[in-house]
């Protein structure tokens, strides 16, 4: 699973080596036993390790609950039935995505937007060309070369954004699983802001993710305007606060993400002060 840990401090965002500790895929538990040396290495890089330890334990509790629920399903219905149901759900998501795409008129729909450039005065331009043909959709993105700032995004972040945004327009009732991705193809030039390569900084990638949703919505609004909401706040702002507790003298760290607002829908106004799109939304 994924969780936010507030105080892995960074020293800037010129490249990924400045963005705090990097942890490869490693086992925190092995055969149910805590690998204490791994945990200590992680906590040593925190300013408030007692809080981060609670975060880690919460993540592991969520994993254990997930394992228990899957085992309970297998015990009740049998492993083969559970696996078959999973495959059927993926196939169902694919069918719904294809049916939804087929309801959009064939054609190529283009849209571009601007994004603040952290390296120099002026803006960067992002653009998308969405080609709908039958029950398939291809999305191609153009953006400037990756920058020495944390707003670059790796290709997997672009993919998850595309899957979310396409689902919201094509058919919001599609189950969120890999089946919905089968009719979609995505391309973007390597080494650009929207498809960066090592050692690009990526800590603030949620900001361009939000703008990519705006791109997709802007393009598809030309074909099915009744299905697309107006542009939302277009960013995810966050602030980290740190200080000493006057009662205990202990250090504390607090991270808060700040919601902007959602755009109007076809028949309703938007909402104020809420998170939108690639923030607290159920993503793949």
Q: Residue ranges of each PLM-predicted region?
A:
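Glycine/proline-enriched, intrinsically flexible loops and inter-domain linkers
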Residues: 1-136, 142-284
């Amino acid at each position: 699973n994924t969780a936010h840990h507030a105080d892995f401090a960074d020293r800037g965002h010129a490249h990924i080596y400045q963005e705090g500790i990097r942890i490869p895929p490693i086992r925190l538990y092995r055969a149910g036993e805590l690998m204490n040396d791994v945990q200590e290495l992680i906590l040593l890089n925190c300013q408030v390790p007692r809080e981060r330890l609670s975060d880690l334990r919460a993540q592991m509790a969520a994993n254990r609950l997930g394992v228990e629920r899957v085992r309970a399903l297998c015990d009740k219905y049998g492993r083969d039935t559970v696996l078959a149901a999973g495959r059927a759900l993926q196939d169902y998501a694919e069918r719904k995505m294809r049916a939804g795409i087929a309801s959009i008129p064939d054609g190529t729909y283009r849209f571009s937007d601007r994004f603040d450039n952290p390296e120099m005065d002026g803006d960067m331009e992002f653009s998308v060309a969405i080609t709908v043909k039958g029950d398939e959709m291809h999305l191609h993105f153009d953006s400037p070369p990756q920058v020495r700032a944390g707003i670059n995004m790796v290709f997997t972040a672009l993919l998850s954004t595309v899957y979310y945004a396409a689902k919201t327009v094509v058919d919001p009732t599609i189950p969120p699983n890999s089946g919905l991705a089968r009719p979609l193809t995505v391309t973007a030039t390597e080494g650009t802001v929207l498809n960066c390569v090592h050692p690009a900084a990526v800590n603030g990638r949620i900001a361009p993710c939000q703008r990519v949703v705006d791109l997709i919505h802007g393009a598809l609004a030309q074909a099915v305007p009744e299905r697309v909401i107006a542009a939302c706040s277009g960013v995810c702002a966050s602030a980290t606060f740190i200080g000493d507790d006057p009662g205990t003298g202990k250090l504390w760290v607090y991270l808060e993400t700040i919601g902007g607002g959602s755009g109007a829908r076809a028949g309703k106004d938007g909402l104020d002060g809420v998170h939108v799109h690639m923030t607290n939304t159920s993503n793949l």
